[in-house]
Amino acid sequence: YRNYDSKEDVLVTLIRDVLELFRNEMKEDPAGLYSYDNVVLSFSYFQKYRKYILDLYHSGFAMAILEEINHFHESVEGTMPSSSIEKYKLYMYTGALFNTAIVWLSEENPVDAADIASFFFRKIKNI
């Protein structure tokens, strides 16, 4: 921990490490992160790291998680010119993904990751 200035720096590094693992498993698809396979992968990762995510969320680090997810999606999908209204698509998606994941993970007996991913994909596919 000597190389970090704060606890948050340590947590952000851990979040980034998980996102890099995700990047290595992503499916190549013209739809990018919005593809069905990558939505399923997203929810499987949320499920795999459920305790870690919920601990961070309940400790007040939800924005740190969301900001890192936003940065990750920007790095994968690219950014739009600041004058383009289309830039909001990415943030609509990441916000919906993260919020849905938190509510889903908070349930005592959450539905299967594939089921929530399928539901999410059907509802979000027009974004």
Which functions belong to the PLM regions below?
Residues 23, 27, 47, 74-77, ...:
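Short amphipathic alpha-helical interface segments enriched in basic and hydrophobic/aromatic residues
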Residues 8, 12, 16, 32, ...:
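Short, structured helix-loop boundary elements
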Residues 13, 17, 59, 67, ...:
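Short, residue-level hotspots on alpha-helical faces of the histone-fold
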Residues 1-27, 47:
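An amphipathic alpha-helix adjacent to DNA-recognition modules
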Residues 85-107, 111-125:
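Hydrophobic alpha-helical segments that form the core
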Residues 58-95:
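Amphipathic alpha-helical packing segments from all-alpha helical-bundle domains
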Residues 26-52:
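Hydrophobic alpha-helical connector segments
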Residues 29, 53-56, 104, 108:
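Secondary-structure edge/capping motif, primarily at the C-terminal ends of alpha-helices
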